[in-house]
Amino acid sequence: MSLPHNEHRQTSPLDILSPPPQIDILLPVKERFGPKNAGAVSGVVHDLILASQTPDLFNVFGHPVETPFDDVSFTPLTPHRAWFHGRNIGLAKAYLNHLNGRPDPALVEVHGRCHVAAHISAIRPDLPIALYLHNDPREMKGSDSVAARQKLIRSMAVVICVSDYIKGCFLDGLDVKDALSTKVVTARNGAHRWLQAPSQKTNMILIASRMVPEKGILECARALTQVLADKPDWHVKIAGARRF
C-alpha cells in the first residue's frame, strides 16, 4: 500500500513509534470505496491517505464493494441488523463487533455521521474518536440542536471541519470561548497540482456537485442568472447526481 515515489516521503513522528498506531476510518454506509463509484467522501479519504506520510497506518471500513481501491487498506462490513438499527448505526455495530478480540485503534475517524460517532462513543467511551464533517452539521441527525452538539463536543477527541464555514455551523449557538471549542478545527481539502503551467481557459463555469437542496444548487443557479445576465459569452455546466 504505497504511492509511486513513496521513498521520497519525509519521516513522520508516527514512524518511530512501536508498535505503530493504527487509525481506523469509518465511512458513511452509502459511500462506495472504490474507483468505479467513489462518492465525494470516499475520494477525499482516499486522497488524504495517499498524501499522508504514513499511509500504511490507516484502515478504511465501509460498505462492501466489488472492486475497492487497491492502494489503501479497506475492510468491508455488512451493517448489523440494518432492518432494526438502520444502515449507518448497523455499520457502526458491525465495526464494533469487528474490534472484538483485536487491538484497539489509536483513533477512530468517523466521516459525516454525527449520530454514528455519538453511538460509538457511547458504547466504547475509551476509544478516541474524531468526527470529520464535510457538510453543515445542523441538518444532521445527532447534531441538529445546540444541546446535541454540546454533547458531541464533550465526547469527541476532535471535530474536524473541511472549512471555516462548517466549523462555524458546528459552533453555532455554542460558547466559542469555552475550552471545549478548541476541539473544533478546520482542515481544508487539498488537491494535487497536475499542471506545470496555467492552461488556456474558456469562459465556462463548471459546477460539480450533487443537485440536491442541501448543496445549495438552487441558490447557485439564481446567483449565476444575475451575475451572467450581461455576459452572453459565458456559459455554465453542472455535473452531478440528483439522488446520491
Which residues make up each language-model segment?
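Short, structured helix-loop element that forms part of the nucleotide-activated donor/catalytic region
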Residues: 172-175, 235-244
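Short beta-strand->alpha-helix junction loop in the catalytic core
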Residues: 137, 165-166, 184-195, 242-243
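An amphipathic, basic-hydrophobic alpha-helix
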Residues: 81-107, 117
